[in-house]
Amino acid sequence: MAGFVYSPYNAYQGYGGNFGQNPHRPQAFPKNKQAAWKSNKSSEPPDYLDHFQRAQLKAILSQVNPNLTPRLRKVNTKEMGVQVNPRVDTGVQCSLGPRTLRRPPPPPSSPVKPTDCARFSRPVAVYSPVVDRRLFSLPQGGRLPKKSLPAPDSQSQPLKDRGPSPEEKEPETKEALEKSPVPGAEEPNEEEPNKPAFQFLEQKYGYFHCKDCKTRWESAYVWCISGSNKVYFKQLCRKCQKGFNPYRVEVIQCQVCAKTRCSCPQKKRHIDLKRPHRQELCGRCKNKKLSCDNTYSYKYIV
């Protein structure tokens, strides 16, 4: 009778249940079995009773006592763990062993059109108001078509009676400034309209001579237009504040024969042709930033 009441095998292995054990046998403490998903070596299913053995046990217990039924157990559940690690491929480890989740293949899409590659639904940059570059793409010809200006309306006619607007006055003032002569400025040649609007300045040796207060000294470095002796920066005399542009630049040549290289026995003033700025009255340029060796220097004026 005990063989029918108590099942000869443990119906609940792995959970440590006391049901189904022979009371005459000494009770042994069940060992905590490691979960199946932790052991990577075994890929066999757990040792649970299948549905056939459970139905057979239920039939035997119903003959002894209809109230005796096997204890409910986890039949359709399995222990599993999900490995989430950004450095390792995402995998699901269950009783059947580790299995890597694979992404489903993307659905077949239509071939990409050339217009789809140039879509910009957002602004091109933070500082750029352009939302779509296709709006500003040039046609195949390479130039944008010129739009014809709209014809003047009849409403613009009464505006002329009020007088010239400030925008119309600006070109008139510009024309007046261009016509008025500027001291020291060279008039551009009409033959060379594409001449750049800049000049090179050359530093030359000159002298300061005011005809009003009769002030004169030598060894004056003057900024002149390159290739000429015209003084670029013109100002009043520092002493009397009357004489305009007292700076002069003398030609570097002999004052007797008017040659750059000469062999005259006597000269009006001693001029070293190799270093023409070094004259008898010169001497203040020594050991200074603008020394005799750095006579000529160029400056770019825009």
Curated annotation (Swiss-Prot):
Annotated compartments: Cytoplasm, Cytoplasmic ribonucleoprotein granule
Expressing tissues: Oocyte-specific.
Any GO BP: oocyte maturation
Residue span of region Disordered: 15-46, 88-117, 138-195
InterPro entries for the chain: Zar1, ZAR1/RTP1-5-like_Znf-3CxxC
Biased composition (Basic and acidic residues): 159-178
Any one GO MF annotation of this record: mRNA 3'-UTR binding
Keywords noted in UniProt: Cytoplasm, Developmental protein, Differentiation, Metal-binding, Oogenesis, RNA-binding, Zinc, Zinc-finger
Zn-finger region bounds: 3CxxC-type: 203-288
Pfam families reported for this sequence: Zn_ribbon_3CxxC (PF13695)
GO annotation, cellular component aspect: cytoplasm; cytoplasmic ribonucleoprotein granule
Domain remarks in the Swiss-Prot or TrEMBL record: Disordered regions undergo liquid-liquid phase separation (LLPS) for the formation of membraneless compartments that store maternal mRNAs in oocytes. The 3CxxC-type mediates binding to the 3'-UTR of mRNAs.
Stated family: Belongs to the ZAR1 family.
Role, per record: mRNA-binding protein required for maternal mRNA storage, translation and degradation during oocyte maturation. Probably promotes formation of some phase-separated membraneless compartment that stores maternal mRNAs in oocytes: acts by undergoing liquid-liquid phase separation upon binding to maternal mRNAs. Binds to the 3'-UTR of maternal mRNAs, inhibiting their translation.
Record's protein name: Zygote arrest protein 2.S
Lineage, highest ranks first: Eukaryota, Metazoa, Chordata, Craniata, Vertebrata
Gene: zar2.S
